Every structure is written in structure tokens, then in C-alpha cells.
Amino acid sequence: MKKMKSVLANFILTTSLVLQGASGFAQDRDAVKQLSDETIRPFKVHIPQAKLQDLRSRILATKWPERETVADASQGVQLATMQALADYWAKHYDWRKVEARLNALPQFTTNIDGVDIHFIHVRSKYPNALPMIITHGWPGSVIEQLKIIGPLTDPVAYGGKAEDAFDVVIPSLPGYGFSGKPTTTGWEPVHVARAWITLMKRLGYNKYVAQGGDWGNAVSEIMALMAPPELLGIHTNMPATVPAEISKSLASGTQPPAGLSADELNAYQQLGFFYSKGLGYAQEMGLRPQTLYGIEDSPIGLASWMLDHDARSYELITRVFEGHKEGLSREDILDNITLYWLTNTAISSARLYWETFQLPKAGFFDPRHVAIPVAVSVFPDEIYAAPKNWAEKAYPKLIYYHKLDKGGHFAAWEQPQAFSEEMRVAFKSFR
């Protein structure tokens, strides 16, 4: 038990290392040769039919275990959920539909530090649109953001005003989706942040904002710490705000500090649950990602691994496959899982955790002391709901804080209209 607490204490992830100097990162590590090719190349998706047939065959050939011995998800992803998902995936799901949606959008690749970066880039038809780079996390992808492209780039068609328009840049993280897979070490969130700054320069933007949750928050906050003059501010739906005394208490497994407000106690309990029961996936990917051959070889293995990310997302997905109408559809969920399968990125995406674990230990949710303007949207079913006073302490230039009544970890995907409205309000002052 002591060893487990020590592992958890070290885990409380690791990306805040940039407190000690993200701005100096480029000097050292750019022994990685910069390629002179800055070409931006159009990109289309086409998956060979043989790959889709192979996927279906593998699903139908799944070797199932016995049912869990409990009535809930305390032993992991439940057999009934996985069998319902597998049945729909093999018999009804059509990858070509999302492939067509992707190919209807302007997609590109460009090489940064030796890795081809895939991104969607949609310019608004409205003048003076504010450029925004949006970063996904794990187990997400650019699929998460497809529903917000319309409301952000064409707000008039979705109840907004022309002056609310954004240009959107939505990259796939290195090792994820249609981006290239790094063949050397060193692609952790600091390197990704620097690559995104390069990407926005390459696209010719002299001002922009950044948005992210999950790894996207880490990347966006690190971009803010690097403070390129073009970056006006950031928005996060999974903020890093946990005070030091809270992190210390959680890591040691002691009682919460006295005097917490109701919101603070709720956040403490949510974080406590996540750290004690929700970190299995991150521990394995952070320590031994190459061992995950099973999820690279079995679509059901991959799907169950991705579903076991956080309890509330799992509950939502279970309800969807039971036939309930929720923020996500069965197609949404399978689009994302199938993207990971077809691009063979189960292990390459996991390496982002390993890369981060190699860095000096600091907490993923620990404040990074971002000095530029920050906006925060709190969705109730996120891993933890950051209290306003924590956000105010973490972000000296907090320009916006709002608690919503619906939505979770995949906020843009689950609640695209509400998420888009948050972006319009949060970044209004930068117009």
C-alpha cells in the first residue's frame, strides 16, 4: 500500500515541469534536426476496404471472458457494455460516413521537427474572425471537435453573430490519428506546445487564442508560458488549479484540510476518487506503453481500454449502448475508437504519457502560474469541477469563469452548442 501511495504521489501527473523554464526548452533539444520543408500539403482520408473487413472479422472473432463478479463497474469495463458495443460495431457501424465528414473539411499535413502533423484548418467566411488552435487529449482525437467547427466558423447559422466567428486549427497530436508517429524520444507536451506555435506561424497568424482540455490543457498552458506575442489568451475546460496543500493531502491519503467550502470539498472528493480508482490506464501508459500489444491487436481490447478512462464518461457511454439518447451517439463513440484502430495508434498515442513521466515530477492539476489571460469553463461531469477561488489563485489574469449544468470530459463533443457559446463569450474581449 505504501508503494502504491508513493506511485500515486509521483503520478499526480507531470507536465508542470515547465514552471522551471518552458521558454528555454528549444535551445537544448533542437539537436532534433529541423527539416527545411515547411510545405503545407492537402490531406484526404481513405482507408482500404480490406482494413475495414479485417476489423469486422476481428470483432466477430473476439474471445470473451466471463462476466464480472460484481453488479457495477468496480472491476472495470462491464461485459454487457462491451458486447453491446461489439454487436453494433460489427453489424451496423459505417466508417465511410465519418471518413466523408473528414474529407469534406480542409485537412492538411506539415512537417515539424521531423514529424508530419495532421490538422484540420477551416477559415471563416466572416472578416476579422479570431483564429483559435484547439488541442484534443487521450482517448480523444480530432473527432471530438467535428461538431463545433460549424458553430465556431459560421456562428450566424447557429444562433450567433458574425462578429463571433473563429478560424479553427485542429491538429492531431504526434502519434495520434493521422499525424506521424515520432521515431525518437522527446515528444512531450513542451515539444508539442512549441510545434503548435510553429504551426500557427506557418499558417501566417499574427494573433490567435488556444483551447484545450486533458492533454490539450497542458499544451495550451505551456504555450502560454512560452508567451509568443501572437498568443492572446487561452481557454480550458480541464484547468490546472489544485492548490499545493490539496495536492499534498491527496498524495498522502490524509483527510482533507479543514475549512474547505462545499465546492472545494466536492472537487477534493472527485480528485480523490480519480487518484485512487481512476489512474490504472495512465500508470500503465506512463510506465510501460510498449507492453500494450493486446490493444494494438484486438479491437475489443482497444475499445475497452479507451472506455476505462474516467467513470462519468464510461457511465455515459454505457447508457448510449443501452439505447438512451445522450450527448454522444453510438456512431460518435465508434468513430473515435475506429480512428485509433485504423491508424494503429494505440501504443504511439500512449507514449505521450511515457514521455511525460520521464520529466521532473509535478502535478498535472498543479497551477502553472500562467501570466496571460485565461478563461475557464467548468462542466459538471469532468474529472473534477474546479472551484472559482482555485481558478482565481491559479490564473492571475482570469478573464472568464463559468459553471455549466451539462457536459463532461469530452465537452465539445458532448455539448457542442454550449461549448461554442462558451468560446464566443470567453474570447469576446480579444476581438
Task: Give the ranges of each region predicted by the language model.
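The serine-hydrolase catalytic nucleophile loop
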Residues: 138-150
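Conserved acidic catalytic loop of the alpha/beta-hydrolase fold
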Residues: 190-208
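Conserved alpha/beta-hydrolase
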Residues: 152-178
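Conserved hydrolase catalytic core segment
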Residues: 151, 155-158, 205-256, 260
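Non-catalytic accessory segments flanking enzyme active sites
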Residues: 51-123, 332, 341-344, 348-363
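C-terminal subdomain of alpha/beta-hydrolase-fold enzymes, centered on the catalytic histidine
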Residues: 276, 283-431
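Glycine-rich "HGGG/HGxG" loop immediately N-terminal to the catalytic nucleophile
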Residues: 95-97, 160, 173-187, 221
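Short beta-strand element of the alpha/beta-hydrolase
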Residues: 129-137
